[in-house]
């Protein structure tokens, strides 16, 4: 089971780009909690959804530990997702401090413990923690779009390449997206942190599109010669596994 869960991370570790990465008015790293979930026997999705929206969100707001919360299901899945057998993926994005505060209240208060017990009766979820660093964000589009497409691509640093080299290259490519976003409304990197010692790479590229048509604009750009830039990136900076796509629905955004 452990290998299945970790193999699934090659598919499911998706970044849910939100304005939370703009905390304190600057682009910087934030906490991304990934919940790989399967409904327990006899539990319907509507029942689970009611728990999340009517109980968890209200509890989080009352306790001042709200997070950006999105749920993802596969669009173009790889075999690792199919083998893992999960029903959906939930992503909770906030500051590292707020994430810790939320967990302390979830585990250390009677109200949190009660909800935790109910959550575990409804679904079985494997929880992983990562850090996410934004490169390019269209804030207006991200704030308005609650139903979108998210792609991921796991990569490992090439020999002799430092993270400083990588960040410099990403900054260069982000500036190019400002001129021509090629269908994207967000791009970031996810870095494994806690419970992810067997992650399939050093980091993942995450791209957000408003819809499938926009995602195909990027694919068209690759077909029209953009593949050369992707080849150069793989040769000179990091070796990547290839894209997978998820459908994302934003269920809670404290900023909107």
What is the predicted function of each stretch?
Residues 1-4:
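Positively charged n-region of N-terminal signal peptides that target proteins for export
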Residues 7-16:
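Bacterial N-terminal signal peptides
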Residues 10, 21-22:
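Cleavable N-terminal signal peptides
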Residues 22-256:
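Short S/T/G/P-rich N-terminal loop/turn motif that feeds into the first structured element of a domain
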């Amino acid at each position: 089971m452990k290998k299945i869960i970790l193999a699934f991370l090659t598919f499911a570790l998706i970044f849910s780009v939100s304005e939370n990465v703009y905390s304190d008015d600057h682009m910087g790293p934030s906490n991304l909690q990934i919940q790989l979930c399967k409904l327990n026997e006899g539990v319907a999705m509507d029942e689970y959804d009611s728990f999340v929206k009517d109980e968890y969100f209200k509890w989080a707001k009352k306790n001042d530990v709200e997070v950006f919360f999105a749920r993802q299901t596969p669009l173009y899945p790889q075999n690792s997702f199919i083998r893992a057998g999960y029903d959906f993926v939930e992503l909770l994005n906030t500051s590292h401090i707020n994430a810790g505060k939320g967990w302390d209240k979830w585990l250390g208060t009677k109200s949190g413990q009660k909800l935790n017990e109910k959550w575990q009766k409804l679904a079985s979820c494997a929880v992983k923690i990562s850090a996410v660093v934004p490169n390019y964000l269209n804030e207006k589009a991200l704030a308005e779009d609650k139903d979108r497409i998210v792609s991921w691509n796991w990569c490992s640093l090439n020999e002799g390449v430092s993270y400083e080299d990588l960040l410099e290259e990403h900054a260069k490519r982000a500036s190019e997206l400002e001129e021509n976003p090629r269908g994207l409304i967000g791009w970031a990197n996810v870095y494994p942190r806690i419970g992810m010692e067997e992650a399939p790479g050093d980091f993942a590229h995450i791209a957000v599109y408003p819809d499938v048509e926009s995602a195909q604009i990027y694919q068209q750009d690759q077909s029209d010669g953009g593949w050369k830039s992707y080849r150069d990136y793989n040769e000179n900076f990091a070796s990547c596994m290839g894209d997978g796509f998820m459908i994302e629905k934003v269920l809670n955004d404290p900023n909107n």
